[in-house]
């Protein structure tokens, strides 16, 4: 559980991005979790990185797990909200292939453009704990929307390959590892989305799909 209370005043000027001390704590934790590891990071080191007392941190987050939960939730909330909107709001208006491409491109862009590469935390042993059930459920729902759209996209081509959506989901999440290795470019999210559609049998229509996908992103984001 987290607290939105103001906490105690700091003894130095803010040195991190964020409108509030809570935002600065999240930014510091994200940096430390992704650079030195979750297990190796203490709440004291997070507080030191923000420039506040450890006791002040506890006004905002009771435990380190609370911080991790908030960060993990943030990695899927935007992509899931967009996928829900596209899956429901554009049904019957845009082709399934275009909707899958838009979801993949939007999701991949979020993963690649976030300040810290938080996706590398997905497979921490700690995340298997039931306290992270909300994050795990949201990620599973997002994966299910990929599958739904992928099945529809493949079905339109006469293919029976409903796994295209799941493969697209995995291609998008592979951007996390590519980013960790310094191999992500500005084109990487588009390349992942394109590859997913090709695997769904929609390669010949890719130019039209890209155009409709861009329109969906402009409309629903």
For each feature predicted by the language model, list its residue ranges.
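Amphipathic alpha-helical segments used for helix-helix packing
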Residues: 99-102, 110-133, 147, 166-169, ...
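Generic hydrophobic, amphipathic alpha-helix propensity
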Residues: 21-29, 46-47, 71-83, 146
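Hydrophobic alpha-helical connector segments
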Residues: 70, 84-113
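Helix-turn-helix
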Residues: 24, 32-70
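Amphipathic alpha-helical packing segments from all-alpha helical-bundle domains
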Residues: 80, 128-170, 194
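Hydrophobic/aromatic residues within well-ordered alpha-helical segments
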Residues: 64, 75, 79, 100-103, ...
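Arg/Lys-rich, glycine/proline-spaced intrinsically disordered segments
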Residues: 7-11
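C-terminal peripheral helix-coil segments that are non-catalytic and often amphipathic
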Residues: 1-6, 143-159, 177-221
């Amino acid at each position: 559980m987290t607290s939105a209370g103001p906490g105690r005043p700091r003894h130095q000027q803010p040195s991190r991005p964020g409108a509030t001390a809570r935002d600065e704590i999240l930014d510091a934790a994200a940096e430390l979790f992704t650079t030195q590891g979750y297990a190796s990071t203490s709440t004291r080191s997070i507080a030191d990185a923000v420039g506040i007392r450890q006791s002040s941190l506890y006004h905002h987050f009771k435990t380190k797990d609370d911080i991790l939960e908030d960060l993990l939730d943030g990695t899927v909330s935007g992509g899931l909200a967009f996928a829900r909107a596209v899956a429901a709001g554009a049904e019957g208006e845009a082709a399934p292939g275009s909707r899958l491409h838009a979801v993949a491109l939007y999701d991949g862009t979020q993963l690649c453009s976030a300040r810290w590469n938080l996706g590398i935390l997905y497979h921490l042993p700690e995340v298997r704990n039931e306290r992270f059930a909300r994050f795990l459920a949201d990620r599973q729902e997002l994966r299910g929307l990929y599958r739904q759209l992928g099945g529809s996209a493949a079905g339109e081509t006469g293919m029976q390959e409903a796994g295209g959506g799941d493969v697209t989901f995995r291609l998008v999440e592979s951007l996390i590892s590519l980013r960790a290795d310094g191999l992500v470019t500005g084109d990487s999210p588009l390349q992942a989305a394109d590859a997913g559609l090709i695997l769904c049998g929609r390669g010949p229509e890719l130019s039209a799909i890209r155009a409709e996908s861009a329109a969906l992103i402009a409309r629903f984001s």
